[in-house]
Amino acid sequence: AWYNNQFALIPVQTIYELNYINGKAHRYGIEREDGEPFTVAALYEIVKIGEQIVRSMTMLTTNADNHPFMLQFHKPEDEKRSIVVIEPEHRQDWLNMHHEDAFELLKPMGAGYVAEHLPKPKKPLKTAQMDVFNG
């Protein structure tokens, strides 16, 4: 996908990362300070396997070992990673870029993001009535 210039953007409101506090994983949501959505650099691929067409995408990340904000996420012993955010003024460039030029936009996310502890929501208990109406 990289060498075929199959660049994509994934619009997001929040991304989730784990922050390890006292050895325990805590789920955090990361958003822009202004609450606006943002776009993550991605690659896409469409392949035919037998008679089936398979579509896939991957978000791009970059090393964040020295990133002042992203350094807090992932296990302490693991490499720190940051998604690559494509700013609005570069979105069209990213989609039309040649892979040899794309490295200039592969940077860790910039300033202007906040993290909030967001525990995973608990699943509601199923009742017989819910099963009847929800299949």
How would you name each of these model-derived features?
Residues 1-135:
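A structured binding-face within diverse protein domains that lines the active/interaction site
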